[in-house]
């Protein structure tokens, strides 16, 4: 069973992916964790590292290739990241989670203990950089949701509600854990 969970910053993908992986007994691969770890190693904020990555395509390619290879090796996995739905071609279920930008900014501000105005500006900038990078490096339009099986507004549900919707989709699609 392979599930991808994607969405913009603050939409809840990391939280939801962790819970889904735990409930289904699957391994979790998170691009965001890798990206944040690399930013910290360089002594940069996520926004600074996003700008750095725009000028250094090897960063994105390293993260994306690593995530893709890890997902291909695993039979039972939840892959979380903005591009995971695009890179994990053989996923059984591809999920896109979104929320109103103000809801997302508020979540990020709370999570990171930052001022909402600062988060709003940083997140908009980050999303602009990422959108350009994805198009420039991969010809991916991140706003094209047609590749996803399931699209959920996390502003309308708490994390557990989003998880329940995903678990119901797994049940409806009759997706099973791969025993091989």
Swiss-Prot record:
Query: Principal place where this protein is found?
Result: cytoplasm
Q: Can you name a GO cellular component term?
A: cytoplasm
Locations listed in the record: Cytoplasm
Q: Sorted alphabetically, which keywords does the UniProt record give?
A: ATP-binding, Cytoplasm, Kinase, Nucleotide-binding, Transferase
Gene3D superfamilies membership: P-loop containing nucleotide triphosphate hydrolases
For this UniProt entry, the molecular function terms from Gene Ontology, in alphabetical order, are:
ATP binding; CMP kinase activity; dCMP kinase activity
* Residues involved in ATP binding: 7-15
Known EC number(s)? Answer: 2.7.4.25
Keyword Nucleotide-binding listed? The answer is yes
- Indicate the enzyme's highest-level EC class: transferase
GO process annotations (BP) = pyrimidine nucleotide metabolic process
Q: Origin, by domain of life?
A: Archaea
Catalytic activity reported? CMP + ATP = CDP + ADP; dCMP + ATP = dCDP + ADP
Instruction: State whether keyword Cell inner membrane applies.
Output: no
The family note in this entry says: Belongs to the cytidylate kinase family. Type 2 subfamily.
Q: What is this protein called?
A: Cytidylate kinase
Q: What is the lineage of its organism?
A: Archaea, Methanobacteriati, Methanobacteriota, Archaeoglobi, Archaeoglobales
Gene that produces this protein: cmk
């Amino acid at each position: 069973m392979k599930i991808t969970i994607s969405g913009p910053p603050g939409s809840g993908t990391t939280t939801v992916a962790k819970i889904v992986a735990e409930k289904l007994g699957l391994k979790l691969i998170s691009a965001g964790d890798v990206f944040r770890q690399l930013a910290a190693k360089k002594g940069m904020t996520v926004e600074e590292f996003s700008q750095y990555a725009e000028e250094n395509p090897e960063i994105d390619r390293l993260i994306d290739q690593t995530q893709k290879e890890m997902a291909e090796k695993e039979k039972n996995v939840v892959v979380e990241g903005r591009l995971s739905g695009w890179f994990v071609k053989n996923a059984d279920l591809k999920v896109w989670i979104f929320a109103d930008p103000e809801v997302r900014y508020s979540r990020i501000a709370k999570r990171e203990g930052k001022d909402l105005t600062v988060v709003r500006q940083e997140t908009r900038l980050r999303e602009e950089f990422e959108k350009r990078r994805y198009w420039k490096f991969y010809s991916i339009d991140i706003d094209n949701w047609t590749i996803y099986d399931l699209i959920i507004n996390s502003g309308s549900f708490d994390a557990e509600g989003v998880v329940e919707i995903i678990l119901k989709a797994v049940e409806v699609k009759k997706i099973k854990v791969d025993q091989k």
